[in-house]
Amino acid sequence: MAPHVIFIHGMYLNGQSWQPWVERFAAAGFSCSAPSWPFHNGDPHKLRLEVNPDLGDLTFAAVTDHFKTLIDDLPERPILVGHSIGGLLVQRLVNDGFARAGVSISSAPPQGVVSFSPHFLRANFPHINPLAGNKPVYMTPERFHYAFCNTLTRPASDEVFERFVVPESRNVPRSTFGGSARIDFAAV
């Protein structure tokens, strides 16, 4: 029997964004799931209209613990696939022994790996802005096109935005600067 595969989304998305991958892997004989982070489950449009008041307090460690709990309920360790900060979650979970294997796609950097590229800083500062407190951050279609879907046409990017984008906690990326996002590269 093929191992279970868990797909882990990145910021501003939820598990629905992995649906085409889940369908493709299921057709190949894998059991799959794409659970959402805390406060991310549901219809993206509704989540943009009705933001959970606790979203702003969500941290990288809390999301990691959420997935550890889900994985502990499985009969065996899964294969993990994650994108962006979901890829960093995969590395952390593999590091901590919660996966048989992991694939990180365009991973966010772990603690201690920092880029000072002007593009990186421009794309990421709004998400970690220390002056914004713990208020959730809302992606605009313009910003989404610049920071996430810049290889798509603007109309195609806007379609992706409408289908998948949700509000986010600034504390998830902020907290990756601390020990919760430290990776022992010898272990992964």
For each predicted feature, which ranges?
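Alpha/beta-hydrolase
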Residues: N134-V188
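Active-site glycine-rich loops that stabilize anionic/oxyanionic intermediates
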Residues: G10-N14, S84
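Gly/Ala-rich beta-loop-alpha elbow adjacent to hydrolase catalytic centers
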Residues: V81-G86, V90
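Conserved alpha/beta-hydrolase
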Residues: F25-E50
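Conserved acidic catalytic loop of the alpha/beta-hydrolase fold
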Residues: A61-P78
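Flexible "cap/lid" loop of the alpha/beta hydrolase fold
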Residues: F98-N134, N171-A181
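Short beta-strand element of the alpha/beta-hydrolase
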Residues: P3-G10
